[in-house]
Amino acid sequence: MTTTTASLVKTFLFRCDSFSSFKFKCKFESPAKTRLLSPATEKHVVRSSRAWRIRCLSDDPGSSHVFVASRRKMVVLLSTVQLLSHMLPQNGNAAEIYPVMQNEIRKVVTKGKAAGVLRLVFHDAGTFELDDHSGGINGSIAYELERPENIGLKKSLKVLAKAKVKVDEIQPVSWADMISVAGSEAVSICGGPTIPVVLGRLDSAQPDPEGKLPPETLSASGLKECFKRKGFSTQELVALSGAHTIGSKGFGDPTVFDNAYYKILLEKPWTSTSKMTSMVGLPSDHALVQDDECLRWVKRYAEDQDKFFEDFTNAYIKLVNSGAKWNML
């Protein structure tokens, strides 16, 4: 096959999600000089094509679909394919090991321990910096447990270690994957949304730099700027803050994942003279209702729990993919 004829560039094999066994292959064929039949003369003419052909092949040998794209669109497509390949499960056994992880996690993570496990996710992934793509979800939290901001997380990691030992007996998984799935299960255990998590993250062999997590004392403007550096919008900041609905921060039932966090924020109980209510939430929680842009989303989520669940799910998936290094087969 010469360079003037259609040639195979690369074949990609994808698994649609971590629960599906459906696969498809795409062959990217370079532009070729194509012999066409001219309707006017009924003669064959040679025309140099500027388009690329994408042939999608199913497991059925007799089934395929061909799409045609311009060179410019092909550049965009190839870039998108490369990006998506990092967002899809890289391990061929992901569909088999994922339910095992869920099962073992649920054996050790009770509703009372869910908040600590979810906090583990934020403290591992929250070190991500968009400008240099440093930090992020990489299991480095295991080396950072003595830091002041991570006090109390050693217990949560020990809880997950019990589940990880069982999972590793079947198939070794990274701490980054284990923490990501555990956070999702913690939300679900407490009545929150079911959040799908793809597998294939690699662990870091060293701790992330210090001082990358947002301090609890930040103002609203400081929070927005901090989350912006990590690639998150104000809406995503407010949605992710809803994780404080479980735990001991004082936002309703500590074992129920719902939108009580936002309803209580609007009541501003910390302004009361009562010693108990004055301790509700962190300064960073209080800051959300002192900023017009944040307040708009606080009100929206207080009124619509389904919207909160939807936006939290999307933001969580983004969080546990932030800065991830993926296992390339």
Curated annotation (Swiss-Prot):
Recorded E.C. number(s)? 1.11.1.11
Q: Which PROSITE patterns match?
A: PEROXIDASE_1, PEROXIDASE_2, PEROXIDASE_4
Entry's Pfam families? peroxidase (PF00141)
Task: Copy out the cofactor comment.
Answer: Binds 1 heme b (iron(II)-protoporphyrin IX) group per subunit.
Q: Which domain of life is it from?
A: Eukaryota
Per UniProt, where does heme b bind? H244
Its needed co-factors are: heme b
Q: Which SUPFAM superfamilies does the record associate with it?
A: Heme-dependent peroxidases (SSF48113)
Family indicated by similarity: Belongs to the peroxidase family. Ascorbate peroxidase subfamily.
Q: What is this protein called?
A: Putative L-ascorbate peroxidase 6
Species annotation? Arabidopsis thaliana
